[in-house]
Amino acid sequence: MSLETLKTLIPDYAKDIRLNIGSLANETILSEQQKYGCYLASAHAVGEAQTLRAIEAEARGKLSVEALNAAKAASAIMGMNNVYYRATHLVSNTTYTTMPARLRMNVIGNPGVEKVDFELWSLAVSAINGCGMCLDAHEAELRKHGVTSEQIQAAIRIGAVVNAAARVLAAEAALAAEPA
């Protein structure tokens, strides 16, 4: 599978999503590694089988083994951090925001790829998972490293489109499995 295959699976009612998959893949504002790492981290975050298989296959042709693993690691660690930090931010008792997380997250300090790339991937996943506190933290870190607003937006857009594609395909699969 590939992004082209993924696009063919998207029904006509979601044509905008199908077109966005292709247009984002053709954008040059992010490096190839940044772009396909965002796609892969986002696909792992949403976990829908067809989306994940298509994007994983595409990414294998574009990313080094180290970058593949780092994109997956970004999704994994954000799966934990986004829930934890979103919860501490949302709970009314502010005590939790002052407590140490006491969760292992060493991959953030040593992801095996450029820090900026890992931060972009973490940002895309944080957008999918809806953690405002994490989005603010990753955006601030990216800005410190000279990443532009347009590049940050591109990562978020990739996350949004991958999420939408996965939701469409999951809904279609659920309907297809319904007994007649």
Curated annotation (Swiss-Prot):
Signal peptide: none annotated. Disulfide bonds join C131-C134. It is an enzyme of class 1 (oxidoreductase). It catalyses: N(6)-[(R)-dihydrolipoyl]-L-lysyl-[lipoyl-carrier protein] + a hydroperoxide = N(6)-[(R)-lipoyl]-L-lysyl-[lipoyl-carrier protein] + an alcohol + H2O. GO terms for biological process: cell redox homeostasis; response to oxidative stress. Its EC number is 1.11.1.28. The keyword S-adenosyl-L-methionine does not apply. SUPFAM superfamilies: AhpD-like. Pfam families: CMD (PF02627). The active site is at C131, C134. The keyword Chaperone does not apply. Keywords: Antioxidant, Disulfide bond, Oxidoreductase, Peroxidase, Redox-active center. InterPro entries: AhpD, AhpD-like, AhpD_core, CMD-like. GO terms for molecular function: alkyl hydroperoxide reductase activity; disulfide oxidoreductase activity; hydroperoxide reductase activity; peroxiredoxin activity. Antioxidant protein with alkyl hydroperoxidase activity. Required for the reduction of the AhpC active site cysteine residues and for the regeneration of the AhpC enzyme activity. Belongs to the AhpD family. This is Alkyl hydroperoxide reductase AhpD. It comes from Hyphomonas neptunium (strain ATCC 15444). The gene is ahpD.
